Amino acid sequence: MAAAKRVGVELDEEQIHLIAKALADPRRYELLRQIGSCTAPMECADIRCCQPVSAATLSHHMRELEMAGLIRVTREGKFASYTLRRDVLKAYTEQLAKI
């Protein structure tokens, strides 16, 4: 019997570096934990109320997490919601385990 084909996320070196950089910041790590603790997409307003930073600072951190591929952003008009991309996080930890 043939081996099952593995379906997953392939990370290139650039994305691995972006993820490492994103997770190195304690605020972004906490934001990722906060988003990951929800089973449904988390609204920006809900994230904002729990973070003692300005809207601009929060926006910067969320953009870094998005650029790293760690979160999926869904925009509806001027509102945004965020979801943890568990597949990307899993692929990253698997890459680290190979070191």
Please tell me what each predicted stretch does.
Residues 49, 66-67:
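Alpha-helical residues within the helix-turn-helix
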Residues 99:
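An amphipathic, aromatic/His-enriched active-site/gating alpha helix that lines ligand/cofactor pockets
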Residues 62-63:
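Short, hydrophobic-biased segments on the C-terminal half of alpha helices
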Residues 18-54, 76, 80-88:
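N-terminal helix-turn-helix DNA-binding core of bacterial DNA-binding proteins
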Residues 1-23, 68-70, 76, 90-91, ...:
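N-terminal leader segment of winged-helix/HTH proteins
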